[in-house]
Amino acid sequence: MTTFQYSLVFLVLMAVIVAGDVANVTYDGRSLIIDGEHKILFSGSIHYTRSTPQMWPSLIAKAKSGGIDVVDTYVFWNVHEPQQGQFDFSGSRDIVKFIKEVKNHGLYVCLRIGPFIQGEWSYGGLPFWLHNVQGIVFRTDNEPFKYHMKRYAKMIVKLMKSENLYASQGGPIILSQIENEYGMVGRAFRQEGKSYVKWTAKLAVELDTGVPWVMCKQDDAPDPLVNACNGRQCGETFKGPNSPNKPAIWTENWTSFYQTYGEEPLIRSAEDIAFHVALFIAKNGSFVNYYMYHGGTNFGRNASQFVITSYYDQAPLDEYGLLRQPKWGHLKELHAAVKLCEEPLLSGLQTTISLGKLQTAFVFGKKANLCAAILVNQDKCESTVQFRNSSYRLSPKSVSVLPDCKNVAFNTAKVNAQYNTRTRKARQNLSSPQMWEEFTETVPSFSETSIRSESLLEHMNTTQDTSDYLWQTTRFQQSEGAPSVLKVNHLGHALHAFVNGRFIGSMHGTFKAHRFLLEKNMSLNNGTNNLALLSVMVGLPNSGAHLERRVVGSRSVKIWNGRYQLYFNNYSWGYQVGLKGEKFHVYTEDGSAKVQWKQYRDSKSQPLTWYKASFDTPEGEDPVALNLGSMGKGEAWVNGQSIGRYWVSFHTYKGNPSQIWYHIPRSFLKPNSNLLVILEEEREGNPLGITIDTVSVTEVCGHVSNTNPHPVISPRKKGLNRKNLTYRYDRKPKVQLQCPTGRKISKILFASFGTPNGSCGSYSIGSCHSPNSLAVVQKACLKKSRCSVPVWSKTFGGDSCPHTVKSLLVRAQCS
């Protein structure tokens, strides 16, 4: 062989090694097909921009351990192209690094390119400069929009291809999404909307990724794109694929819901999520994505209007990346049970059998020795049914999974997974006035502003999304000083009013009602008076038709002076975009030196004050959080990086702040002397109440009945599938407890085998109780990082109350 031939062979081998294993991804009416093999896939949404590169490996590893096969993420256009033609893929924006990290863990990727994503993200992910393109109308058959959408989509796909990230190149991306929930707005555009959908599908095909494309909430998604479902109950609400040759895909199964300021959080139980996933699988669903699996943090100004900084904290992995139990563990067991059924589910015929008015059996299998069944009870009451000559007690509103059509391996209403208690502990108090310095914004006068208009300007058009804040000022003559009333009709989100430099009041809207009327009494000078209004946005809109037409800000300004009304809509107004502290970047070390700071003084006479202090990083590896419970409204920075907006003073209807703790990723921190800067808009904020906290799981609890199935054994080395899953139907259910890494069970706080009252949140000994409960559990668990206790009378020395369904409830402390 010649030297040239050796070189050629070497290059070919290197190309194969670099590319990895090329996969052929297709689909039929049952599921996605990867290299000729049908797959049931569980996916979890983890957004690279809502965490940090340092967190990615742990998040992905925990997702894999929880039975996730696919990591799903949006691609954020406004993050990657904040200015037209200027691209940024650095730091937490490094999507290539994120996808490669997913591949390193042996998982697939679903890439949701959008480019409109909604996602409670500023402007739905669209860059604001797009708003300024002449003649543009978003998300319809509009040439300027289509031009930029195509240019962006091609750029992202080209980037993915250049890194060999599609499965057709040996990469992990097996599925892509174009557009997002267009069915929610399509009617507003009528025929142009239908044309846009067809054009979008054609664009996706032309991008030639070698993997299938989906459109969610788009019932008429053109071939070959697959229409997919979003929502909490797709097993009940999804009409199904629009072609018999397309699989049933659930792109967003909401594990909780995003929270807005002033609204209570929506808590969704592990049992409810599992029920609807199992029901979707029973009805031939084959791909389920949890939105979110890890929500993370809306750092900076990335949250959309009125959305809090913490995002989907109730997901299986919480905001800090800690396991949210029992949600994480219960879904892991569900995934394992379904994987036990994968072969008959995908290769067998489905038969539906009525077991009662609200009870149904879905049976899968071609052969007698290859059979799986899913028993569904839609009733709110327990039901006993007969199936294949055996009796089954079905819990209320539950689904039972029978991998062999005989034995129950999993029931959605019976939780074997432990419950966790998350605790925040103050590590450093910033309570000394000597620790703080302050700098107060000055209220600009008309003559100090650089933008002039003879009418009221719209907020977003003026700020161009460079700041949440817009000053609008004017001056007028008053012949005599007199009590007067200022009336401002405002389209949100908040407004602070000043007359002659004095603060006279504030008002704000809500997520559901942006518009409000600020009406404040004031005293005017005899002669010239200066009126200054600070319009404040709390995130850009992110959904609905015609985003490019949205307006925010003052719509009318009036002053009643006791005799007549002055109208200011067509007065000369001066405008200033942003605050002085923003202009000088006072939240950075260099910018901080550009203004004159003063020693903190306990004065609440003026809002719009910047505070700065320094703190040392808490020891250990527990997540770090900033407790802002003593503050009002504003934004916080650590070492120049924004950890997000806060609005502690906006309480829910139950009287609670929407959010108190704000995540500081450890990668933002230095060992010592971290710069903390707070912008406080309101007068009531007190920085002396701020603490630096750590977050950890300090208590674990298990509550398992002797009627529960034994947990599915799932050795998680190469992924969940039938080959590496085993199940022993003769084994007893058990309580399993595990402390976080580095901690052990130090104390048993409660233990009762029998009929304990309550649950892990609130409990007491019931009428039936084994006196050996505490001793048995202490022997099995104390000084161990993990333990298990069989829920069986023999474990506790006998049955003191026969013919009674018993359970074991254990609560333990981790130290």
Curated annotation (Swiss-Prot):
Q: Where is the signal peptide?
A: 1-23
| Keywords carried by this UniProt record | Apoplast, Glycoprotein, Glycosidase, Hydrolase, Secreted, Signal
Glycan-modified residues: N24, N253, N284, N302, N389, N429, N461, N521, N526, N570, N724, N757
Q: Which GO terms describe its cellular component?
A: apoplast
Q: Where in the cell is it found?
A: Secreted, Extracellular space, Apoplast
Q: Name one GO biological process term.
A: carbohydrate metabolic process
Question: Which CDD domains does this entry report, sorted A to Z?
Answer: Gal_Rha_Lectin_BGal (cd22842)
Principal place of residence: secreted
Catalytic machinery residues: E181 (proton donor), E252 (nucleophile)
Q: What is its EC number?
A: 3.2.1.23
Q: Where is the SUEL-type lectin domain?
A: 729-815
Q: In which tissues is it expressed?
A: Ubiquitous, with higher expression levels in siliques.
* PROSITE patterns in the record: GLYCOSYL_HYDROL_F35, LECTIN_LEGUME_BETA, SUEL_LECTIN
Q: Name one GO molecular function term.
A: beta-galactosidase activity
Question: What catalytic activity does the UniProt entry give for this protein?
Answer: Hydrolysis of terminal non-reducing beta-D-galactose residues in beta-D-galactosides
| Protein's UniProt keywords contain tRNA processing | no
Family in the record:
Belongs to the glycosyl hydrolase 35 family.
Q: What is this protein called?
A: Beta-galactosidase 16
